[in-house]
Every structure is written in C-alpha cells, then in structure tokens.
C-alpha cells in the first residue's frame, strides 16, 4: 500500500472517481471529478484519506450509513449520494448514451426519469445471526461484511419502519451464524418476506415463526426458498390497477414509480396494436396493462409467475384474451415463423439481455418493439442486432429506478 495525492478526472461506470497515475488508472470510491484527494493506494484501487480540494458538485449524503464515515461501516447499497442532483442525473443518462455509442447507435435519448427517495418497495437485505440478535443490513461494497442499518432513505418507510419485525422473523428461522438473504416486498396487504440461504427450518422453528408472525400486524407472507411457511394474508400488488398475487420470492419492479413510467412509455408506443407478445413477462407487469388494448400472448420460464398472471387475467373484467406459455426464451426463443402472428412485441429480460430472441426478432415482420432493460450494455447489444435487421430505434428513455447506485433502467422503442 502507498499513499499519494491525486486529482480525479472523471467518474467510472460504477460511480468511482478515476485518477490517472503513471502506472495506470486508479479507481477511488466517493471521490468526484475535479477533486484533489489524498488516497491509500493498493494496485488500482484507492481509498480516500482526506479531501484537499472538494468539487462544487459535492453535497452532504442523506444517509448516516453512506461513505467511508458511515455508521457501522460503509453500506454498499448506494455509491452516489455525495453527488449533486444535476450532475448525478447527467451521469445516469450518460451510462445509457455511452453504452449505445459503443455499438454505433445514436438514437434520441430522453432526459432521465427521476425517481424519489423512499419509493423502493422491494429490497434484498443481508442477514446473519449474532450473539446480540440478527444483524440486518446491506453488504459493504466488494466485501462479505454486513453493515447493520438503522435507516434507508431509498427504501419505503413501510419497510424501514418494520426493521425490528423483519429481524424477529429472520431470527426465528435461523440456527447458525451463516449469512443469508431476506427479500422484502411491500404489498397492499402487508410485507411479503422471502428468505434464501437457510437450508431448512425444523418443527420448533416453524412454531416459533408462526407465533412471531401472528403476534404482528402487517405481515402478509413468509417463505423460504419459494416454499410458503405462513401466509396470514395473500400478498397483493397492482399492475395498472389490476390486482395480482405474486409468487413467493418472485420478481417485481423495485419501485412502482419506475414501473408506471416504463408502462406509460410502452403503451404509448404499442398504441392500438391488436396482437401483442410480452416476452419475459413475469407475473404480468406489462401483459395485464396490454390486455386492455389487444390480445396478449405472455411468455415466461417461471411457472409460478405465469400462474399468478393467468389467475389475475381470468379474474379481471374488461381485458382482451391473455394466453400464457411456459418457455425458456434463452434456449427456445419465439421463432420468426411464430412472430408473424404479432403486431407488437415487448420484452423485459434479466440483466443478461435477450440476444438469442433478438436474432429472431430481427428477421421478423413485427412492426413495433419495446425493449426494457436494467443493463445498458446488453440493451445496446440487443438493439444493435435489431437495427441490423432493419429496425429503427426511435427513442430511448433512461429511468432512475435504482436511486444513488450506478445502475439504471432504460426503455427503447423501435419500429420497422
């Protein structure tokens, strides 16, 4: 380890400040462009020891757990709370612009859709049993160390206010000091708590869990690795006003605000399409909204998610027909011959993107496509495939679903 004073030239894709040293770039978390900082350097990583000259874009973080001086350690949940709003918004938009540019794409890119603090309805916590109880928080960046949190300005107050209840539920299920994960989804009927990383619970633990949950208010369900352990109330969320009970541990957009913004962009482009395919549809985030305007074929690999979607569609009046298909689109994409049945296609894949499916789409005659992605790099790759097939990207909109992190959602609309 060496100590030296450096000047930060730019922000990297992970939100770290980048300094240029004789032996190459050095990445310095929590440092901003234009700042002069003293760092402790190990290989290409720097730790801020002091700030000699601060940037005018620096601001005080809103959370006590943020940064090198955070309470209980440096929480890895956020990396950009110290950056003022305007340059922060520009940074997020540039993540999308630069990813597109790397594939030779220069479509119109909208300003960032801004999401507010306290909107995150789904959070994944790290947890571990200790002598004092249950340690609950987020892992420190690039570390297995769990930073115990007492607040979280990103997460919904409906979750933050129940930290004690979440700890009690986790503690009733765990027998050793191995770390595990607790995913909490705030639903209209209470918290939906999904635990992963614990192999099993015995009969005594089940009884303790049941007693713990029934003594509380506002807990809808507790599950372990997808198995429902107790469900006082069926968890309910709404997709465009349509009630859905998502599967235990299933995927849900992190914030309703971002989901609504993405859905609005999607619906505006799909317009009056009569036959629509929703690929990687999950529990119906977009499919159920689309069914108000046209027939929908919803495709997803997760059986429980499809069943939730199907049940919601069958029990909602006023929707056009919705068909569902269980299918692994990474291995068995909809072929060009199948795609000829649709006027519009919407796809929202995991971070890996939809490369194989896009190769089929590129050869199709589908008039309108909406691509939703949480990874600008794989989105750019997929859009490049589609443009090579004759599609034109008419608009890309970045959405700040992951506040104060280096991650960004984006919606791209295409036509042929």
Curated annotation (Swiss-Prot):
Residues given in the record as [4Fe-4S] cluster binding sites: 63, 75, 78, 152
Entry's EC annotation: 2.1.1.-
GO MF terms, alphabetically ordered: 4 iron, 4 sulfur cluster binding; metal ion binding; rRNA (uridine-C5-)-methyltransferase activity
Gene3D superfamilies reported for this sequence: 2.40.50.1070, Nucleic acid-binding proteins (2.40.50.140), Vaccinia Virus protein VP39 (3.40.50.150)
PROSITE patterns: SAM_MT_RNA_M5U (PS51687), TRMA_1 (PS01230)
Binding site for S-adenosyl-L-methionine: 253, 280, 300, 348
Coiled coil: none
Active-site residues (renumbered): 374 (nucleophile)
Keyword terms of this UniProt record: 4Fe-4S, Iron, Iron-sulfur, Metal-binding, Methyltransferase, S-adenosyl-L-methionine, Transferase
GO terms (BP aspect): rRNA base methylation
Family: Belongs to the class I-like SAM-binding methyltransferase superfamily. RNA M5U methyltransferase family.
Protein name: Uncharacterized RNA methyltransferase Atu0735
Species this protein is from: Agrobacterium fabrum (strain C58 / ATCC 33970) (Agrobacterium tumefaciens (strain C58))
Native organism taxonomy: Bacteria, Pseudomonadati, Pseudomonadota, Alphaproteobacteria, Hyphomicrobiales
């Amino acid at each position: 380890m060496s100590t030296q004073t450096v000047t930060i030239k730019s922000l990297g894709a992970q939100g770290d400040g980048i300094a240029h040293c004789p032996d190459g770039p050095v990445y310095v978390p929590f440092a901003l462009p234009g700042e002069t900082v003293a760092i402790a350097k190990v290989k290409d990583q720097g730790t801020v020891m002091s700030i000699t000259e601060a940037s005018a874009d620096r601001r005080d973080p809103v959370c006590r757990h943020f940064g090198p001086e955070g309470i209980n350690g440096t929480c890895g949940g956020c990396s950009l709370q110290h950056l003022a709003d305007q340059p922060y918004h520009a940074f997020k938009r540039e993540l999308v612009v630069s990813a597109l540019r790397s594939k030779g794409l220069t479509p119109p890119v909208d300003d960032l859709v801004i999401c507010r603090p306290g909107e995150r309805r789904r959070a994944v916590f790290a947890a571990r049993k200790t002598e004092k109880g249950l340690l609950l928080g987020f892992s420190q960046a690039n570390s297995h160390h769990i930073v115990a949190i007492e607040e979280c300005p990103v997460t919904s107050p409906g979750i933050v206010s129940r930290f004690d209840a979440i700890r009690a539920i986790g503690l009733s299920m765990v027998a050793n000091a191995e770390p595990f994960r607790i995913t909490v989804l705030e639903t209209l009927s209470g918290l939906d708590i999904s635990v992963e990383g614990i192999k099993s619970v015995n009969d005594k633990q089940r009884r303790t869990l049941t007693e713990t949950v029934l003594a509380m208010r506002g807990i809808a369900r507790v599950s372990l690795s997808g198995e429902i352990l107790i469900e006082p109330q069926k968890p309910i969320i709404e997709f465009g006003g349509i009630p859905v009970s998502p599967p235990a541990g299933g995927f849900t957009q992190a914030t309703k605000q971002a989901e609504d913004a993405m859905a609005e962009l999607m619906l505006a482009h799909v317009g009056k399409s009569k036959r629509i395919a929703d690929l990687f549809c999950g529990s119906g985030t977009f499919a159920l909204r689309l069914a108000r305007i046209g027939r929908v074929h919803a495709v997803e690999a997760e059986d429980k998610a499809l069943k939730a979607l199907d049940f919601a569609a069958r029990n909602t009046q006023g929707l056009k027909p919705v068909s569902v298909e269980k299918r692994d689109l990474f291995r068995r994409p909809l072929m060009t011959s199948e795609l000829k049945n649709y006027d519009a296609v919407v796809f929202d894949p995991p971070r890996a993107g939809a490369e194989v499916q896009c190769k089929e789409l590129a050869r199709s005659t589908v008039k309108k496509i909406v691509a939703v992605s949480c990874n600008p790099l794989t989105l750019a790759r997929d859009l490049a495939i589609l443009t090579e097939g004759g599609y034109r990207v008419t608009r890309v909109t970045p959405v700040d679903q992951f506040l104060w992190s280096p991650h960004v959602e984006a919606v791209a609309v295409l036509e042929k």
